[in-house]
């Protein structure tokens, strides 16, 4: 029984990561060129967030289409609730607003959006390019 569980766990880990697109190559290159300058890091993250946001919209469509017709309303509702939760978590008002808190906000939005898009891709078996 333990061996079956271990096998399923390993298969689950690899199957999820097999489809995960993660950050774009442009983002990785951009971040390497920032020289740890906060304004440049912010610019890279903002661009990547826009890319991941579009990607999320793109991969949600086949994910929704794959759901049974009677469950599509719930899938849409769940997606909208997730968007609201992401925005609430990432856009909380800091006591002091500065470059670092803005970086935290955009990093949160970017990473949560990328992770959700990765999940939709893994569940549909499609990889967006």
Indicate where each model-derived feature is located.
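Sec-dependent N-terminal signal peptides
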Residues: 4-15
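N-terminal alpha-helical modules
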Residues: 19-129
